[in-house]
């Protein structure tokens, strides 16, 4: 079954977000993140995409996200920043995880840079 590029992107975004929440080991609500609404509006993410995300790998999702438009990459970065900012202080491991994710999708931005952008909006 082949997916459209839009569907592949949505599922890849959900896969990465679910993996991040799981790795954080706390119950974080993705949908209550400040920037998630904009990300959802821009990509048309539906609840079913989170279900679909359970059957794809994080690695294949990163490959998909590399080709995504930079506006969407920015919204993903801001949403991940929202998730991580729920933990105070944000641990070094989370900052490194953020930068590793951004490098993997070819959107090299540091956590401190995205945090500054997030706070000025």
For the regions a protein language model found, what residue spans apply to each?
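Small-residue-enriched hydrophobic alpha-helices in membranes
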Residues: 1-121
